[in-house]
Amino acid sequence: MSSQSSNTESLSRFPLWQVITPVRRKVILAMALAGLAALTSLGALLFLVWSLRDIRATPDAIPAWPLGGVIGCVVLTFVLRLQAFNTSHYAAFHLENILRSRLARKALQLPPGVLQQMGSGSVAKVMLDDVKSLHIFVADSTPLYARAIIMPLATIVILFWLDWRLAIATLGVLAFGSVVLVLARRRSEDMAQRYHKAREQVSAAVIEFVQAMPVVRTFDSGSTSFLRYQRALEEWVDVLQTWYRKAGFSARFSFSILNPLPTLFVLIWSGYGLLHYGSFDFIAWVAVLLLGSGMAEAVMPMMMLNNLVAQTRLSIQRIYQVLAMPELSLPQSEQQPQEASITFEQVSFHYPQARTGTALQEVSFHVPAGQIVALVGPSGAGKSTVARLLLRYADPDKGHIRIGGVDLRDMQTDTLMKQLSFVFQDNFLFVDTIANNIRLGAPDTPLEAVIAAARVAQAHDFISALPEGYNTRVGERGVFLSGGQRQRITIARALLQDRPILVLDEATAFADPENEAALIKALAAAMRGRTVIMVAHRLSMVTQADVILLFSDGQLREMGNHTQLLAQGGLYQRLWQHYQQAQHWVPGGTQEEVVENERQ
């Protein structure tokens, strides 16, 4: 806990300007242009005062040079500001692309379990909202920052040159408003953290509500999921209201003080007194009024910028928390497996945020190359965890996992993935054509090979029956297809990869009875010559496996083939009996019980 807090603390102090290093030159150029625009806008005011002085001295003459200076400075100010914002926006787009690319590459290098713990809402917020927040800062704030700094400094210098007394009066108003603003900011730092946390929860609730819509409408008309979303939204609104109560008055009061009107009032009142006693020139007084009120107007964006900077710092903190997450360890000198055997050696593992105990406890087994191994057991026994660890979902807490005698941690990720193809129960299809979904990982595969893989996976017939065949585009996550159809497409995808190890996690979970036998036969042909790890709840799938591993409570309890395990009379035998009873179950009892009741 302490290391995590210290890491967060160090990230919170991460220099804001260091983040923009890839686009620093463009940002500096944009700020320089904005600073020059601020100076030329002051020049326009000075030329205007010069024009008033000449008109007062010689009313019949037109002050051509001063008026020309006003027009020239106004045009130059417009051009410089336009170029400043163009430059800063191009820099922001470039930085946004860099950060999203870095985050995407980081996500590919993180253990999948870490991303699952973060949740889709958190990941989406970092890659979308937080990066967008940094884009807004670079695009809009950096030129305003330059103007908000350069213009007041230059104005103060000119005011002291005109009259030090009025300059001090102007500084007094700005100092008072700034103190109030700082106090308001201190009160809002903790609330800003709570605000972003609440917004993250709303984002996660929205994603869950939309993705689970078909399920929740079927079972509870969406009331439970909507209630979760409603509570997240209410908490977010509550944070906003609390934030407004704590810092609202101070923020509004500072806005009022730093408004040009209070400064203008002070300068009119004090300047009139000086003018009345003859210690001040009227034209100089006009210059002070124009410059002083303009300085207050230039400082106004600083208040909004301070809030934006605070929000940007939080976004940067979250971005760099993701970028600082530990990646899967990769070897400096890689070892290549020479064959497709699988070995688990005293492997223990627990899910970091799980409330239960360890998912696997000192599991050891060896699978020779080319064997079909089935993993069975009650729900939560650790079967899917074995499959996920084989894919480096995470590294085990203890022990070693080897392919071909090589520890997974001694392989590069690409090398490991070239050994494995897999089909999970929770399949995923992209919004693309069916052919491209099957080609995933091998985009240059000819259509003939795609069709061949689909035939083996028993998917060709239903694909051919679609209006556009293999060019049919599937919806988000494959929503336009049935569960069984999606599963067969993912099986075809795995078969097309033609890798020596095949991992199946409930690959036939969505197969209807008509196609289950054909699918099992097709898979048997596809498994030939490969090492297969098959997680199964349907025990009919495992009877022909070379070895069956039975798990219970995270431990490997029994090992053997179907006949051997039945002969042992242990947990597998009881599971098989329950499975057989379930297969013969009809409403009113098993088929035998129904027949016996009818005889009576």
Question: For each predicted feature, which ranges?
Answer:
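A hydrophobic transmembrane-helix motif
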Residues: 39-49, 76, 144-185, 243-287
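An intracellular "coupling" helix at the cytosolic face of ABC transporter transmembrane type-1 domains
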Residues: 18-25, 112, 129-138, 142, ...
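ABC ATPase nucleotide-binding domain helical subdomain, centered on the C-loop/LSGGQ "ABC signature"
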Residues: 101, 400-402, 410, 417, ...
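Helix-to-loop junction immediately C-terminal to a conserved catalytic motif
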Residues: 391
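Transmembrane helix-loop-helix hairpins at lipid-water interfaces of multipass membrane proteins
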Residues: 21-80, 160-165, 282
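C-terminal portion of ABC ATPase nucleotide-binding domains
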Residues: 2, 521, 538, 543-600
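Cytosolic ends of transmembrane helices, especially the final helix of ABC transmembrane type-1 domains
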Residues: 221, 245, 295-322, 331
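Membrane-integrated ABC transporters
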Residues: 1-41, 61-66, 84, 88, ...
